[in-house]
A protein has these predicted regions:
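Structural core segment of the AMP-binding/adenylate-forming
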Residues: 48-49, 69-72, 76-135
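A short helix-loop-beta submotif of the ANL/AMP-binding
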Residues: 56, 62-82, 86-90, 100, ...
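Conserved AMP-binding/adenylation subdomain of ANL enzymes
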Residues: 164-178, 186-226
Length: 237
């Protein structure tokens, strides 16, 4: 069935046993229902800060469960997420934000001086966690690149923010997969594979920071079926 990406947490919360874990980072675990409710709160908080369908939202957060609450909240607003490293120097951040022109920046550094921003530790207190209904975002993601010129670019993925739940996902990621992500979510591949695991109703084991020994332990502990490594990670393992 084709559904909005924004509805993925609710879709699986309603179909999986109560308390089923969707995402873990270390000891921090998030069930499908928690992901749905927390993303709904954030979506309403973002809308209160002016985010509208068709907008771009820059996410400058480290790897963690909050990142996914935020990305799903952006889709629930009918907007498109862009992931940036939260440690980006002020000048580089300013150049990227000038190209992107996001309606909101979530996280990042205080010296980015974004006109509309929320801090890394923002908590959406006082907002309803009931389902949110908004138009589907025209682009499911917009990632940044310096490319061969070194000048910041925003690369739009022209796939709308919808997903087919009745078939296996891209890259051979099967339904109910156990997937490990050791890479930073501001890179395109980790962003894609991590969210694709969730689109498939799988369990995502995320790493805050890559560690070779911990990677092998997590693979064994969680019966991981799918992981993406870059060559430097393979060398360290």
């Amino acid at each position: 069935m084709l559904i909005p990406m924004a509805d993925v947490p609710r879709w699986y919360a309603e179909r999986k046993p109560e308390g089923t874990i969707a995402i873990t980072h270390g000891k921090d675990a998030l069930t499908w229902e928690q992901l749905e409710r927390n993303a709904n709160r954030r979506a309403r908080a973002f809308a209160a800060r002016g985010v509208k369908p068709g907008d771009f939202v820059a996410i400058g957060l480290p790897n963690g469960n909050t990142f996914f609450e935020t990305s799903f909240a952006v889709w629930k607003c009918g907007a498109t997420p862009t992931s940036l490293t939260w440690r980006l120097p002020r000048g580089e951040a300013a150049a990227v934000l000038d190209v992107l022109k996001p309606s909101l920046v979530v996280g990042g550094q205080p010296d980015w001086n974004a006109p509309n921003s929320l801090p890394v530790d923002f908590a959406p207190e006082g907002f309803s966690d009931e389902p949110v209904d908004n138009p589907v975002a025209r682009y499911w993601k917009a990632m940044t690149s310096g490319g061969s010129t070194g000048r910041p670019k925003v690369i739009l993925d022209h796939q709308p923010a919808v997903v087919e739940t009745s078939v296996d996902q891209r890259l051979g990621i099967v339904r109910d997969v156990s997937l490990l992500n050791p890479g930073p979510l501001y890179h395109n591949a980790p962003f894609i594979i991590s969210h694709t695991a969730l689109f498939a109703g799988g369990r995502l084991t995320g790493m805050v920071k890559f560690d070779a020994e911990e990677t092998l332990r997590l693979i064994a502990e969680n019966s991981v079926q799918w992981v993406n490594f870059v060559p430097t990670m393979m060398h360290r393992i």
